[in-house]
Every structure is written in structure tokens, then in C-alpha cells.
Amino acid sequence: MDTIEIPALNRPVDATVEIPGSKSLTNRALLVAALAQGDSILENALFSEDSEYFAKCLEQLGIPITLNPHLAQIQLAGRGGEIPAKQADLFVGLSGTTARFISALVALGNGEYRLDGVPRMRERPMGDMLTVLETGGATVNFEGNSGFMPYTVYSQGFAGGNFCLKANQTSQQLSALLMIAPYAQQDTIFEVEGTLVSLSYIKMTCRLMADFGVEVIQIGDNQFQIKAGQRYQAQHYTVEPDASNASYFFAAAAVTGGRVRVKHLTKQSCQGDILWLNVLEQMGCQIKDSDDYTEVTGPKQLQGIDIDMNDISDLVQTLAAIAPFASSPITIRNVEHIRYKETDRIKAVVTELRRLGVQVEEFPDRLKIEPGPITPAEIETYHDHRMAMAFAVTGLKVPGIVIKDPGCTAKTFPDYFTRFFQMLEQ
């Protein structure tokens, strides 16, 4: 297995960086552009394993799509809600957004569509969304455990109507259903039982739908109404830089007491993970925001924090990776759902922090990290891109941190380590 050793710095970082387009926005834009009537162009689109699996699935479904990675541009010809292919065998890799969004998309078709992924993807929950699709007219045939891949969707259009679903494990299922709802045969209302995890991602979905011409009426945090007959309009759409992936560069400034500026990303971003800036501010960082960049300057000493990260749970690993350098303990709460991601992220973080000699307490939905010295070690990444990217930041402060399987970042940020090392050279 390949490894990368992170060079520890004896100085603060001082750099300006550019981050590729958002994975979450790229895949949402691909779906709504495929449903729109006419040609859309996505600028600053992300080219990674996740987005390429998504594009391949659209191509198999008969949506004409042209990828230009050198320009970070994707062109596709939307078919106005039609799914041209009547049969397809679709592979989603380890991409949760592809799995959920494509499953919802094929429910609008009239045919037979099999979906499968890598072994870990077969363990990730799909059931609530599939129950809605079945109630709306589809038939789902599971080859193994009910509610999990692989399965075949037999579809004849989505009826719409009133649905109740749980969203305590992932918000991606609700996002998928929201995006297909304008093409239902009647108005659709989704009511969420209990607390909706990652609400910020639902808000991002609704904002992107509005950018393409469709309104979602939200009542409180738990009810969403979509009028039937609305149609997405083809767009020339620029994807924002990925706020989740920018978090590692901002964390580098925080942990070294340095300065990092990320171009073309601002506090006005529609991505919920821009709230990472608020976390860093509470820990003692200074934030400078302009109309075309955001800049973080780290303090001499990071402060501990007790924080609910339900809405920004993709950043748990980023915070955990810098937590040992704080002046007091860091407690991360309300993130049980991250146990169902690319790996059990709570367990993985706890295991690797302990490998580094850090004292950490694990609970079902939270963890508490004590500050203290770190022992160099090789970090297991569990095929999880965010483990590799986050613990690289730890290595800036401690010599001898080695990241195993750095290629796993290809899922959302193929050239992460190239850009990370370029930041260090500035």
C-alpha cells in the first residue's frame, strides 16, 4: 500500500490556494441539469471518482454528456424529465450521492434499472428513500438485505403525494427525493420524522433547485412542499469551490498559527460547511472575508470547544485532527449518523487518535478529545478520503506522521496532496 509522510513545519503556513469545485454541488447540478430541457454547462465542476461515477450513470441512462476535465467543465443535454434508457446496470462505487440521486432519478423512468456499489456501499442505508419510491409507483427488488444494495428498480414514473420519512442517518435521501419531485404526477409533500441530520445540505439542495427555476416551500425544519409541473431550466452554472475540502487548508492555518487564503470561496457560500469558519473563530482564529476569497489566520494557541456538529458532520475529522493541539478538551456532539459514511467515522477517528497517543472518549453519538503530546504513527484511512485529508494536517505539527493509502482522496479531491504540498512551499 502506498504511503505519504507529511513534512512537519517549523514555521506558520502562509499561502493562497484554489480548491476544486464542490462535490455536493456538482452532483446535484448534474441531476437537475439532466432533468432540465436543453443544454446546460457546469463550470468549475469537480472531476473525481464520485462525479465520474455519476456522469457515467447519466450516460448509461441516455443523457448526452461531455466531460472536459482540463477546463473543469461539463456539458449535458437535459431531456426534460425523460429517462431515454429503458434498461441499465448502474455501478456507483462508494459514492453515496450517486447511489441515492440516481436511484431517485430512475424512478421517473419507464424501465428496469439495477444499482450496485462496492462492498461498503452495500452497507449504507437506502431504505427510507426506496420505500417512498415504492409508494410512489416503483417496484424495488433486493438481491440481499432489504433496504440495501444491490437492487433493481422497476419504474413507471413517480406519482408524488404525501410522504413521511426518517432522516436520522443521512440527508442525501431527502435531497434526492426533493430534486425529482417537480416531475411527479401530483404535488408532493415530504414530512421528516424527528431531527433531520445535516439540514444545511437540504438547504443547499433547495437553493440549487431555485437556481435552476424550481421552488421548494419549506414549513419549519421538517416539511417540504413541491408543486408538480415545475420544470428545471437549463443553465450556465458555476460550481463553488468545495467548502468541505477547503476546511483542511483553513485548519492548516489554524494549527500552525499561519495564514491561508482560499480564492473564490466566501462566507456567502450556499454550502453548509462554510460554517467551519465559525468553528475556527470560536477556537481563536481570525477570519477575513471579501467578495472573492476567505482568509483564516491562526492564533498562537487554539482554544478548546464543545460543539454540536450535526449540520457540518463532514468536518468532524478535520476538527478531531487539530483537537490535540488545543488548550483544553474538544467535545464533538450529535454525530451518530457519521457511523454510516465511507467508514464508521467516529470509530475510525477514535482508533487513529489513540494510535497517536491521544486520550479520547468514544460515545454512540459523540467523542471527547483531550489535548496532549502526539506520538508519530502511520494513519489508517479505511478507504475514507476525509481520514487522509484531515490527518495530513496533524502532520504539520508532528514529525513522522505517515498517511496510508493517500490515493483514497480520489473520491472527492484527486490532487489533494499535490495542492497541500504546494501550500507548504509558498
Curated annotation (Swiss-Prot):
InterPro entries: Enolpyruvate_Tfrase_dom, Enolpyruvate_Tfrase_sf, EPSP_synthase, EPSP_synthase_CS, RNA3'P_cycl/enolpyr_Trfase_a/b. GO terms for molecular function: 3-phosphoshikimate 1-carboxyvinyltransferase activity. Pfam families: EPSP_synthase (PF00275). Its EC number is 2.5.1.19. 3-phosphoshikimate binds at residues 23-24, 28, 170-172, 198, 314, 341. It is an enzyme of class 2 (transferase). It catalyses: 3-phosphoshikimate + phosphoenolpyruvate = 5-O-(1-carboxyvinyl)-3-phosphoshikimate + phosphate. One of its GO terms (biological process) is chorismate biosynthetic process. The active site is at residue 314. It is found in: Cytoplasm. The keyword Transferase applies. Keywords: Amino-acid biosynthesis, Aromatic amino acid biosynthesis, Cytoplasm, Transferase. Pathway: Metabolic intermediate biosynthesis; chorismate biosynthesis; chorismate from D-erythrose 4-phosphate and phosphoenolpyruvate: step 6/7. The keyword Cytoplasm applies. Phosphoenolpyruvate binds at residues 23, 96, 124, 172, 345, 386, 411. One of its GO terms (cellular component) is cytoplasm. Belongs to the EPSP synthase family. Monomer. Catalyzes the transfer of the enolpyruvyl moiety of phosphoenolpyruvate (PEP) to the 5-hydroxyl of shikimate-3-phosphate (S3P) to produce enolpyruvyl shikimate-3-phosphate and inorganic phosphate. This is 3-phosphoshikimate 1-carboxyvinyltransferase. It comes from Nostoc punctiforme (strain ATCC 29133 / PCC 73102).
